[in-house]
Swiss-Prot record:
It comes from Rattus norvegicus (Rat). A motif (GPALPP motif 2) lies at residues 32-37. The modification N-acetylalanine is found at residue 2. It holds the Pfam family DUF3752. The keyword Acetylation applies. This is GPALPP motifs-containing protein 1. The modification Phosphoserine is found at residues 28, 106, 138, 143, 148. Residues 41-59 have a biased composition (Low complexity).
């Protein structure tokens, strides 16, 4: 036997060195998977011719032996050869071990891709070598398969399971009711005037310190900084405000006319003032004002000299706290209403 070849073959330009032992040995198959039955290597042509001649001689000998043995032995031999030929057809790859039995039919190949519609079937086609290849799709409609898959291949909404309550009269009544509502309420599809939302036309609430102020409760409500609507007023709003101001001025002028003193009151007031100047002494308020005026004039004309430190004058210490100051201002505001004459007739 020849030496087993392991590894890649030599290029065609290089010739393998043959030894005497290799020439004496019989050629053996190359290590690796066997070739398909329809393919043969070129190196084995000579050996195949020798094998063919030897096989022919062996077949002749076998036929002669079978003739001697009888017809039964010849029939068994033919059946065995036919089984061997069937086993070799369509085989690729290495042979199975002797303990395993070859399957009669190869398993179906898995389908890759979308499935065919239920009415189409692939027609198998035979190849040149006798093998079946999947052919073109034929639009052959199988009625039995279609009937079995009717329930599974439903596309669209399912039909109603119960009786359908549909009445032509009820549909007409609904349409008439809709038309009646549309006529009574007006056309809802009419274009509405486009108005901006409030956040587009109004200023946001005024924020002080942006959350950085003291975390205490408010003692009193914040005073309004003023009318901030000037920034968002439209021409219509400005015209409306101007009319309101004019009406307010007219009402004030009417009140002033009502409060105007009559000629009789003016005449009596002049007589009373002249009588008081001639007959009565000065009031305490007038005396106090005169003293303050004279003192201020004297201090202005007096020569200024260095005086010792006086805490009240130099530091101007406030003798009233905030609460006393507010109470004094509030009481002084009421003096005019307490000691003034009425708004009507001054004299009876």
């Amino acid at each position: 036997m020849a030496r087993d070849l392991i590894g890649p073959a030599l290029p065609p330009g290089f010739k393998e060195r043959a030894t005497v032992e290799d020439q004496e040995r019989d050629p053996s198959p190359v290590a690796g998977p066997a070739l398909p039955p329809n393919y043969r290597s070129s190196s084995s042509d000579s050996s195949d011719s020798n094998e063919d001649s030897s096989s022919l001689s062996e077949e002749g000998n076998q036929e002669s032996e079978e003739d001697d043995a009888g017809p039964t032995a010849k029939k068994q031999r033919r059946n065995q050869d036919r089984d061997d030929d069937d086993d070799d057809d369509g085989f690729f790859g290495p042979a199975l071990p002797p303990g395993f039995k070859k399957q009669d039919d190869s398993p179906p190949r898995p389908i890759i891709g979308p499935a065919l519609p239920p009415g189409f079937i692939k027609s198998p086609q035979k190849n040149d070598k006798g093998r079946e290849n999947p052919g073109q799709v034929s639009p052959f409609f199988n009625s039995e398969e279609a009937e079995s898959g009717e329930d599974e291949d439903i596309v669209g909404p399912m039909p109603a399971k119960g009786p359908v309550d549909y009445s032509v009269t009820a549909e007409f009544e609904k349409r008439a009711q809709r038309m009646k509502e549309k006529l009574t309420k007006g056309d809802d599809d009419s274009p509405k005037p486009v108005t901006r939302e409030s956040w587009m036309t109004e200023l946001p609430p005024e924020m002080k310190d942006f959350g950085l102020g003291p975390r205490t409760f408010k003692r009193r409500a914040d005073d309004k900084s003023g009318d901030r609507s000037v920034w968002t007023d439209t021409p219509a709003d400005r015209e409306r405000k101007a009319k309101e101001i004019q009406e307010a001025r007219k009402s004030l002028s009417k009140k002033d006319e009502e409060n105007m003193l009559s000629g009789r009151d003016k005449r009596l007031a002049e007589q009373v003032s002249s009588y008081n100047e001639s007959k009565r002494s000065e009031s305490l308020m007038d005396i106090h004002h005169k003293r303050l005026k004279t003192k201020a004039a004297e201090d202005k004309n007096r020569h200024q000299e260095r005086t010792p430190f006086d805490r009240d004058k130099d530091l101007k210490v406030n003798r009233f706290d905030e609460a006393q100051k507010k109470a004094l201002i509030k009481k002084s505001r009421e003096l005019n209403t307490r000691f003034s004459h009425g708004k009507g007739n001054m004299f009876l």
